[in-house]
């Protein structure tokens, strides 16, 4: 399936720093960078205020660059509980911002992104930065690391989009076939029930057997 022209917004979620990027798919595996940046919120501010700032900033990006889909890193961390919770709060705000605009969201684990970009699911940040700089033909490495991660997420989705679209198409076809079979089964069951009721009715009242139901149809020449 052709995904040329697909515009993807990649987001590396975080409450203190949230990496944002927008790329556009070209032919084959070609991807063009559109924009990249980082949204920051003050650590000493109230949680609600920080989430509000993040929501507004991300919403402005979505409205300005009009992406077709959002790619977000899945929270997959066993570090500081407070950091993990803050990141989870940020992810919720990001998904809500996308939902308010009717934008689909796809989430990827860090290892999935690393595998897609570098071929190594355990690549370090330096390797990832080198690869994303080369893939997008950037004049210099994107900084900070959150920006590079956001670009990697967006490119990862661009490359996986054709596979996802094929899978979705196959799933839709399978669902349609499944529904068709269910409907046929229901229709067959309804016919069997109706015929059984008619037979029972005729057996209990011979007069009805001599006079077909008004719902029966007779073809005449």
UniProtKB/Swiss-Prot annotation:
Organism expressing this protein natively: Corynebacterium glutamicum (strain ATCC 13032 / DSM 20300 / JCM 1318 / BCRC 11384 / CCUG 27702 / LMG 3730 / NBRC 12168 / NCIMB 10025 / NRRL B-2784 / 534)
Catalytic activity: Endonucleolytic cleavage at a junction such as a reciprocal single-stranded crossover between two homologous DNA duplexes (Holliday junction)
UniProt-recorded name of the protein: Crossover junction endodeoxyribonuclease RuvC
EC number(s) on file: 3.1.21.10
Names of required cofactors: Mg(2+)
Region of interest called Disordered, as start-end residue ranges on this chain: 169-221
Active site positions: 12, 73, 146
Protein task: The RuvA-RuvB-RuvC complex processes Holliday junction (HJ) DNA during genetic recombination and DNA repair. Endonuclease that resolves HJ intermediates. Cleaves cruciform DNA by making single-stranded nicks across the HJ at symmetrical positions within the homologous arms, yielding a 5'-phosphate and a 3'-hydroxyl group; requires a central core of homology in the junction. The consensus cleavage sequence is 5'-(A/T)TT(C/G)-3'. Cleavage occurs on the 3'-side of the TT dinucleotide at the point of strand exchange.
Assembly information from the UniProt record: Homodimer which binds Holliday junction (HJ) DNA. The HJ becomes 2-fold symmetrical on binding to RuvC with unstacked arms; it has a different conformation from HJ DNA in complex with RuvA. In the full resolvosome a probable DNA-RuvA(4)-RuvB(12)-RuvC(2) complex forms which resolves the HJ.
